[in-house]
Amino acid sequence: MKIKRSFISISVLMVIFGLMISVQFNSLKHPKVRDTRDMWDIREELTSEQKKQEKLLAEINKYDKLLNSYSQTKEMTKETALNNTLQSLKKTAGMTDITGSGIVITISPLFSESLTGEPIENPPPDLLKKLINELNSYGAEHISINERRVVNHTVIRDINGTTKIDGYALDDYPLTVKVLAKDPDMLHSRVKGSGLEDLFASENLALKAGKSESKLTLKAYDRPLDVQQLKLLKD
């Protein structure tokens, strides 16, 4: 399809060349009549025609360079497209570091152990999953919890009484959740207007969200991807 488009573009350029040359040729043709103009008129017309010729040559040179650039980049088009696609997929899959605007959410104990008389528990996995789902529905594009990137196959679960994200323990408060979004203001408003704070408070956890004044950087997902279910497509 791209080769066809390039061919069409070149054809259009050639048509432009033909029209320009035709117009220039017609402008130089004059009927054979007796010239009654004085020398200054002739010189003025000659200068005008020379300028037209120079302009035409400049246009031809410009399109010639354009055609050369097409021929030079045509062979690189497939490789460039594949590379761009690969980088886009890596970005979407969370395999690259990413920097952008967003909000920061902190999760910490609401009341101390001395006040409740009970030990501080890890955040329940289901509660963190609920938070992630809500953030995604509010327009979150990228999320990390304690610098661990959240991707489609991230696993958050309780292992022997400790909440872990992809095998990393979340037992040290406060937890820091970084969230990137196209519209951080709207995301912040949605979080503040939701029932997330009350939901976390029911587990003796304080959830506080604030818009970051500086750019946030989320580290890439650093664990191997499970590709066992992927199959090679046959032609």
Curated annotation (Swiss-Prot):
* Location within or outside the cell: Cell membrane
How is this protein situated with respect to the membrane?
Single-pass membrane protein
Q: What is its main location?
A: membrane
Question: Sorted alphabetically, which Pfam families does this protein's record hold?
Answer: DUF881
Q: Name one GO cellular component term.
A: plasma membrane
Q: Which residues form a coiled coil?
A: none
What UniProt keywords are attached to this protein's entry?
Cell membrane, Membrane, Transmembrane, Transmembrane helix
Matching InterPro entries: DUF881
Membrane-spanning parts: 6-26
Q: Which family does it belong to?
A: Belongs to the UPF0749 family.
| Name assigned to this protein | UPF0749 protein YlxX
Q: Which organism is it from?
A: Bacillus subtilis (strain 168)
Q: What is the lineage of its organism?
A: Bacteria, Bacillati, Bacillota, Bacilli, Bacillales
